[in-house]
């Protein structure tokens, strides 16, 4: 957890100014005890900004440019996913139509088979009747 800490005493402030050689600073610095990084919050004059010491900075923050690049790449990735899903949806729709056509064709074939079976049954019945008549004729 970050905590705001003022310079503890004047000596600490002067040590900071000595490190920068020139400049003044008025404000707070924020210490992150997890990774010992320091962030400044306050007013710096121009010389202090130019000569400030190298201090490890918390890397959790990103610049606007980095964020926009990430957002753009993420948007592009989402667009690719959307187009892929749209193409797959179209394929599924086409396959559904093909399945419906096959079902209609299957129904027509089953009706044709029923008609063929009925015709064969009628022919079988006729043959049976003819056999009975032939038997009667032969028996006379």
Curated annotation (Swiss-Prot):
Source organism: Mycoplasma pneumoniae (strain ATCC 29342 / M129 / Subtype 1)
Similarity comment: family membership: Belongs to the UPF0134 family.
Protein name per its UniProtKB record: UPF0134 protein MPN_130
InterPro entries listed in its UniProt record: DUF16
Top-rank taxon: Bacteria
Matching SUPFAM superfamilies: MPN010-like
Pfam families per record: DUF16 (PF01519)
């Amino acid at each position: 957890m970050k905590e705001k800490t003022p310079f503890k005493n004047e000596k600490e402030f002067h040590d900071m100014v000595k490190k920068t050689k020139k400049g003044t600073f008025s404000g707070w610095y924020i210490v992150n005890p997890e990774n010992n990084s320091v962030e400044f919050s306050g007013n710096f004059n121009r010389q202090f900004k130019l000569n400030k010491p190298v201090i490890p900075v918390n890397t959790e923050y990103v610049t606007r440019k980095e964020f926009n690049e990430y957002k753009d790449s993420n948007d592009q990735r989402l667009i690719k996913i959307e187009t892929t899903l749209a193409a797959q949806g179209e394929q599924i729709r086409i396959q559904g139509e093909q399945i419906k056509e096959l079902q209609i064709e299957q129904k027509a074939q089953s009706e044709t088979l029923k008609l063929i079976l009925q015709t064969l049954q009628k022919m079988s019945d006729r043959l049976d009747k003819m056999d009975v008549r032939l038997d009667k004729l032969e028996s006379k």
